[in-house]
Amino acid sequence: MTYIENIFLCIVSPLLVAALCMGRRQLRFFLFCIVGMGVCLLSAYINTFLAAVCRADALAATAEIAPVVEEIMKLLPLVFYLLVFEPEGNKIKAAAITVALAFATFENVCYLIQNGADRFSFIFFRGFGTGAMHVLCGLIVGGGLAYTWRRTWLKVAGTCGLLCAAITFHATYNLLIAYGGTAQYIAYALPVLLVAAGRLSAFRLSQRK
């Protein structure tokens, strides 16, 4: 049995100390890191509970339950941040990416502890693939929220649409992973390639301007 709450405490403890020592400008980054790992921990409990209640098999839990729960849990702190602090667009995007990054990091650490780290090539591809998938979902949601929350009429519909887009991409990724074989490595490569393509497009647009 993997006691993920103990892992959470071990990882978060130095982050809390660092957050107290750093200035106010860096505090936001550490807080969103802690929040991202916290929602990952809560997502694991909720996924397990819903899988037991629905009597879902491994495939259903991975492709149907986990993407919905995890993307909703990652969205909730961002909505709270938007409602309470009303941040600027660039801060929303940075917060979404930080939460997604911390979520992916904690998920990868728990996976390594539970399954071992002896297969370097597999762990390498999984680390990049899972990290890029969560970051890409964060980019979708964060970039979209920065746009939709500037327009009152788009807030609710836009947020729901962005959440559905992130869930769909996450579910597709998990489904390919669960299928195994070549599809698994396609899943690992897909988010990395999409992030790279997005950054290249952004760079070309900035060069034209």
Segment roles from a protein language model:
Residues 1-209:
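Hydrophobic alpha-helical segments at protein termini of multi-pass membrane proteins
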